[in-house]
Structure formats: structure tokens, C-alpha cells
UniProtKB/Swiss-Prot annotation:
A zinc finger (RING-type) spans 334-372. SMART domains: CUE, RING. The gene is amfra. Disruption phenotype: Knockdown embryos are small and display dysregulation of lipid homeostasis. They show increased lipid content, and increased cholesterol synthesis. They demonstrate impaired touch-evoked escape responses associated with decreased axonal branching. Residues 531-544 have a biased composition (Basic and acidic residues). Widely expressed. It comes from Danio rerio. This is E3 ubiquitin-protein ligase AMFR. The lineage of its organism: Eukaryota, Metazoa, Chordata, Craniata, Vertebrata. Residues 510-544, 569-598 are annotated as: Disordered.
Length: 620
């Protein structure tokens, strides 16, 4: 939190800071000169007149006295420290203009984060670990850490710029030369700081030398790391053809250097913890948290290296090197890096990839990059759990069995808190919230694969709706199992709608038998007709949707005609009320058991008619 406050504080610009520092230094020098001159003037009056040589000697003594006064005074010495910091900032600005030019947003953010973390942590080190009481020692440590932070920022800036330039093959060589020359200069400055550490060992003791040497070694190793990476990149640029072993050199360079930096930092913090009696202080908590973070980083790096070795072993044992005939027959570029292939490895699906590209891919996924076919690289449960926690490093876990239970389809929400962005001693932790959409724990295949299998089954069973086949495939993920379910009746197929003729139904209204025969033929007609399966309501095909709409329209017209014809009276005394239900069956009104409600209504209507006729008077 204090770092956030410092970052949001309205700091002055470099021009304003330089002007204020110059004014402050001038005022301090004038004040010190007036003090020294008064003392020298009083001594000169007591000694009498002097010649020119003595006057020049007195001027030299005055300059020396002013400098000593600035260094020894408890207030003026901080002005000198501020002046040194201002000079370093101006040197850094000049280096930026000559070597880097305008900085990118990410580079500025990295510099800001590293600067404030370094300031906060070294403040804890000076006043919490060393427990410095004298002003002179505080000044010396401030000057020492000012030089260190300057070198750290230069190395960080060179690293960010190298990562940016390495992605562009058209970068001019002059840009690389400038950055590499700056790295060599930083490395030589680290050698000079090592000499200062050796000189300080005779005065301040071995513990102080160990602290200074650890900080100096950290800068040296980081600088050497960037120089080696830069050398590999420049060699690859000037090397003709594809350098297959480049990724291996880069990986082992990163692994050795990062492990060396973490080990040095870990021993440095252990030394700080054991140096002072700080077991019950705030500084001890800070160091303990930093030790925990470094220890977990070492574990994570070693675990990642084991995963790398496991990937190499699986790749070399399972996937053979492609022969020249296969490369000539394929005649294609690598699908990962889009570069031509002189050597490649062949997957079981037949696709070819560079050795380094395939290794990088298998560290993240265990399927073919082109067709997404599972490679079935089986590992233990422990590796699977590690792969869920670190998907970019340890996800070479099992792809699952080929039957039906490979993975669980989950929607994950990953939240990560990086404490090092706020302060280097803050911990980093991650929270992953998962919910499973498949209760049975069966993975859902790719949509394209499911659609292909569903169309294949529908060609064999056209009477089964497409959506029912797709629902069963989402559970079984197997064409054979879904086919068995259809044959054994486990999939409930709805009764299909028959295709109807557009010609109106001709009914014989003269005789009751003719009507019965026509209705009977209508009921029996669907048995002789071919069935047409109605597609899904939300079909993707426009033709299928249009056909479904016309079919539904014809059904509604047919039912309306039937209702109209069956409600029309056929004889003078009797009415035939025929209803069309969902099965298109025509019930007979002569059967009393068919519809008791209709018969009761007819009887009531006949009785009411007779009553009305009796009440009417006779005309004669």
C-alpha cells in the first residue's frame, strides 16, 4: 500500500527535479564557502600579509574545506546524495536517448515497479536488518544502493528491449549493437563494484562484504543472462537455414541463470535472517515472506524442468523422426512456426512438425496442433493435479482413456494476485473457481467431431431425429454405442409425421358406408406411405426449415378440411359429428360408447324440439 501511495504521488519532471537540485546544491555550496572563508579570513588576519603563492594555496585549502564541510555536515551531506542521484538520472536519460529512444508503455511500467520495490526493500534492509545508527553509514549505503538500482534498471531495460527486438527479423544491426554495448558496459561496472566490495572487506568486516557481494553478483548474473540470450539470437540471425537446437540452448540458458539468481537471492535472505537478532520484528516477517516466495519459485522452476524432461522423453519415444520421403511427400511448412521443415517429427495422425515446435506445444497441450487428435500421453494423477494448477508448465498430464472418460468439461475462472508487482516481499497466490457442466464426468468432444458422427449415424437411421442422435453422442462419444442404443430402443424415437397429398379428400356424402370407407382409407393410408422424418425445430439448413414449414401448413389445411366435412350433415334426421384428433382418426357417432357427451346433447336437443312442437297451436 505505501508503494501505491508513492506511485500516485505527483512527482516533478526530470527538468524540474534537475533545476531544483542545482539550486539546492548552489545554495549549499555558497553557505559552506561563506563558513569556510570566514574561518580562513580570521586566520589570515592573525598571520599578517601573504604573497600570491600563499593565496593560491589558501584557495585550494578553501575548496578542500568546502568539500569536507559538505560531507561532514549532517544536513549538507543529504544534498550531496541528492546531487549524486540527480547525476545518475541524467546519465540514464542520456543513455535512453542514445541507445533506446522513446520507451514503450510496458518498459516504463517495468522500470517503475522495479524501482519502487527496490527502494522499499532496501529501506527495510538498512533500518531493519543492519539497524544502522550513524548518519555516515546511512549515506554510504544510500550511495551504494543508488549505483545498484541504476545498474538494475539498465539491465531490466536492456532485457525488455531485447525481447521486443528479437520478434522482428528486420531490426537493423545498429540497434542490437547499441544494446549489447550497454550490457558490456554494465558488466564492466559490476566488476568495478566487485573491487569496491573487496576494499570494503578490510574496513567493515565479512558480513558487510557478503551483503555487498550478493547484490553485486545478482546484477552480474542478470547482465550475463541477457548477454548470452542476445548472443544466441544474433547467432541465429546470421546463421543460414533453420537452427533446430536454438530452443534447447535458450531453455538451458534460462534454466541455469534463473536457478542461479534464485539460489543467490535465497542465500542472501538467509544470511540477512541469521545476521541480526530480528526474530520478533517487522523485518523478520518481510524476510520470511520473501524466503517463502523464493523457495516456491525454486520448486516451481525445478518442477517445470522435470516436466520438460518428461516431454522430451515422451516425444522421442513415441514420435519418430520423419524420413526424407515423408518430408518430400508432405511438402508443407510447420503449422506452428510456418517455417520450412528440413527435419521433423511425425505424429500418429500423420502431421509433421519441427522438433522444437512440437516440444513447446506438448508442454501446453497433448493433442495434435492441426487436427486436435488426442496423443494419449498417460501420466499419473499427481501430474494431472499439477497440470491444473500450472497449465503453462506442468500440463503434460494424461489425455485420458479412449473409451469415454478422458477429461471433465469444466468452466474455470482463474484469479491471480501477483504480490511482487506491489512489493517484492508480498506473496503471490492464485484462486481457481471451477464448475462442471457434465455431471457424469464424461468429456464432451469437439463440436465438429460430434456433428460428423451424428451425420454418419443419421445416414444409417434417417427416421431418428438429428437432435436425439446429438444428445446421445454427447454422453457416449462413440458411434458404436449410439448405434446400439438406437437398435435396442434406448433412444425414444417420436412417431413420424406422414407426408400428405395436396389434393383435397373426396368423400361420398350420399351413403354412410361410403363415408366410412373413405375415412377408413384415410386412416390406413399412412401405413402404405413412406415416412419422412421431421428435422430439428432450430435446423441450420434453410431448405429443411422451409420444407418443415410447408409440411406443417399442409397438415393444418388437411385437418381443417376434415373438421369441415365431418361437421356437415349427411342425412335429414341424423348428424354425423366426426372429430379429428392428434392421430387423425375419425370416430363414429353411431357407437354410443364412443362419445357419451355428444349423444346426451343430441337427446336433449331432440327432447327440446318435441316440446316446442307440442306447444305450438294447430292451424285448423
Amino acid at each position: 500500500m505505501p508503494l501505491l501511495f508513492l506511485e500516485r504521488f505527483p512527482w516533478p519532471s526530470l527538468q524540474t527535479y534537475t533545476a531544483l537540485s542545482a539550486l539546492l546544491l548552489a545554495g549549499t555550496v555558497l553557505s559552506a564557502y561563506s563558513t569556510v572563508r570566514d574561518s580562513e579570513f580570521s586566520s589570515a588576519l592573525s598571520e599578517g600579509p601573504q604573497n600570491e603563492e600563499l593565496k593560491l594555496e589558501n584557495l585550494g585549502n578553501v575548496a578542500t574545506g568546502v568539500l569536507l564541510h559538505l560531507i561532514t555536515d549532517s544536513l549538507f551531506v543529504w544534498v550531496m546524495v541528492n546531487t549524486a542521484c540527480c547525476i545518475l538520472m541524467l546519465i540514464g536519460k542520456v543513455i535512453q536517448c542514445i541507445v533506446f529512444g522513446p520507451l514503450r508503455v510496458s518498459e516504463k511500467q517495468h522500470l517503475k515497479d522495479k524501482f519502487w520495490n527496490f527502494i522499499f526493500y532496501k529501506f527495510i534492509f538498512i533500518f531493519g536488518v543492519l539497524n544502522v545508527q550513524r548518519v555516515e553509514e546511512v549515506v554510504l549505503w544510500c550511495l551504494w544502493f543508488s549505483m545498484l538500482i541504476f545498474l538494475h534498471l539498465m539491465v531490466q531495460l536492456c532485457k525488455d528491449r531485447f525481447e521486443y527486438l528479437s520478434f522482428s527479423p528486420t531490426t537493423p544491426m545498429s540497434s542490437h549493437v547499441r544494446v549489447l554495448a550497454l550490457l558490456v558496459s554494465v558488466l564492466s561496472c559490476c566488476g568495478g563494484l566487485a573491487v569496491l566490495c573487496a576494499l570494503a572487506g578490510h574496513i567493515h568486516g565479512m558480513h558487510t562484504v557478503a551483503f555487498m557481494a550478493a547484490e553485486c553478483l545478482l546484477v552480474t548474473v542478470r547482465t550475463g543472462h541477457v548477454i548470452i540470450r542476445y548472443s544466441i539470437h544474433l547467432w541465429d540471425l546470421n546463421h543460414e537455414g533453420t537452427w533446430e537446437n536454438k530452443s534447447s540452448y535458450i531453455y538451458y540458458t534460462d534454466f541455469i541463470m534463473e536457478l542461479a539468481i534464485l539460489s543467490l537471492d535465497l542465500m542472501h535472505h538467509i544470511h540477512m535472517l541469521l545476521f541480526g537478532n530480528i526474530w520478533l520484528s517487522m523485518a523478520s516477517l518481510v524476510i520470511f515472506m520473501q524466503l517463502r516466495h523464493l523457495f516456491h519459485e525454486v520448486q516451481r522452476r525445478i518442477r517445470r524442468h522435470k516436466n520438460y524432461l518428461r516431454v522430451i522423453d515422451n516425444m522421442e519415444s513415441r514420435f519418430a523422426v520423419a524420413t526424407p520421403e515423408e518430408l518430400a511427400a508432405n511438402n508443407d511448412d510447420c503449422a506452428i512456426c510456418w517455417d520450412s521443415m528440413t527435419t521433423a517429427r511425425k505424429l500418429p495422425c500423420g502431421h509433421l512438425f519441427h522438433n522444437s515446435c512440437l516440444r513447446s506445444w506438448l508442454e501446453q497441450d497433448t493433442s495434435c496442433p492441426t487436427c486436435r487428435m488426442s496423443l494419449n500421453i498417460h501420466e499419473g494423477r499427481r501430474e494431472r493435479e499439477e497440470g491444473q494448477r500450472e497449465p503453462l508448465e506442468d500440463n503434460m498430464a494424461a489425455a485420458g482413456a479412449a473409451d469415454a472418460r478422458a477429461h471433465i468439461n469444466q468452466h474455470n475462472h482463474f484469479f491471480h494476485f501477483d504480490g511482487s508487482r506491489i512489493a517484492s516481499w508480498l506473496p503471490s497466490f492464485s484462486v481457481e473457481v471451477m464448475h462442471t457442466t457434465n455431471i457424469l464426468g464424461i468429456a464432451q468432444a469437439n463440436n465438429s467431431q460430434l456433428n460428423g458422427m451424428a451425420h454418419q449415424i443419421q445416414e444409417m437411421f434417417p427416421q431418428v431425429p438429428y437432435h436425439l442422435i446429438l444428445q446421445d453422442l454427447q454422453l457416449t462419444r462413440s458411434v458404436e454405442v449410439t448405434t446400439d442404443n438406437i437398435l435396442e430402443g434406448r433412444i425414444q424415437v417420436p412417431f413420424p409425421t406422414q407426408s400428405t397429398d395436396r389434393t383435397p379428400i373426396q368423400m361420398n356424402a350420399a351413403s354412410e358406408d361410403g363415408a366410412g370407407a373413405s375415412s377408413g382409407s384415410e386412416v390406413a393410408a399412412p401405413e402404405a406411405e413412406d415416412f419422412e422424418v421431421r428435422g430439428s425445430r432450430f435446423s441450420k439448413s434453410a431448405d429443411e426449415r422451409q420444407r418443415m414449414l410447408m409440411q406443417r401448413k399442409e397438415e393444418l389445411l388437411l385437418r381443417a378440411r376434415r373438421r369441415y366435412l365431418h361437421k356437415k350433415p349427411e342425412d335429414g334426421d341424423a348428424y354425423s359429428v366426426l372429430g379429428a384428433d392428434n392421430d387423425d382418426s375419425v370416430p363414429s357417432i353411431e357407437d354410443e360408447d364412443s362419445d357419451s357427451v355428444t349423444l346426451r346433447r343430441r337427446r336433449l336437443a331432440a327432447a327440446a324440439e318435441r316440446r316446442i312442437l307440442r306447444q305450438e297451436p294447430s292451424p285448423f
